Amino acid sequence: MRKYETIFVAHPSLDEEAVKALIEKFKGVIENGNGTVDNVDFWGKRKLAYEIAKVNEGYYTLINFTANPELPKELDRVFGITDGIIRHIIVKEEQ
């Protein structure tokens, strides 16, 4: 099992309840893939460094999790097909 960190930015047109539902969805993907969620940090709505998809702000969320090496590929796929996600990144934490 390895430690990973993901940050995603949700579209600002969503309300906070919809963003919380997305967080639960991604936590479910991690837990269904035999991973464990170590920490969830919802940063709220923040200004983007540059315009993405014609928007200047978004809801930031950081999730730290422990999982097998195959799980980030599945999580990346789910991020890609989920409406409302502007950007995401998954990185392996250094030991």
Curated annotation (Swiss-Prot):
InterPro entries (UniProt xref): Ribosomal_bS6, Ribosomal_bS6_sf, Ribosomal_S6_plastid/chlpt, Transl_elong_EF1B/ribsomal_bS6
Key words of the record: Ribonucleoprotein, Ribosomal protein, RNA-binding, rRNA-binding
Keyword RNA-binding on entry: yes
SUPFAM superfamilies: Ribosomal protein S6 (SSF54995)
The keyword Ribonucleoprotein is assigned to this record: yes
MF terms in GO: small ribosomal subunit rRNA binding; structural constituent of ribosome
Biological process terms in GO annotation: translation
GO cellular component term of the entry, any: ribonucleoprotein complex
Family: Belongs to the bacterial ribosomal protein bS6 family.
NCBIfam families: S6
Function: Binds together with bS18 to 16S ribosomal RNA.
Protein name as annotated: Small ribosomal subunit protein bS6
Name of the encoding gene: rpsF
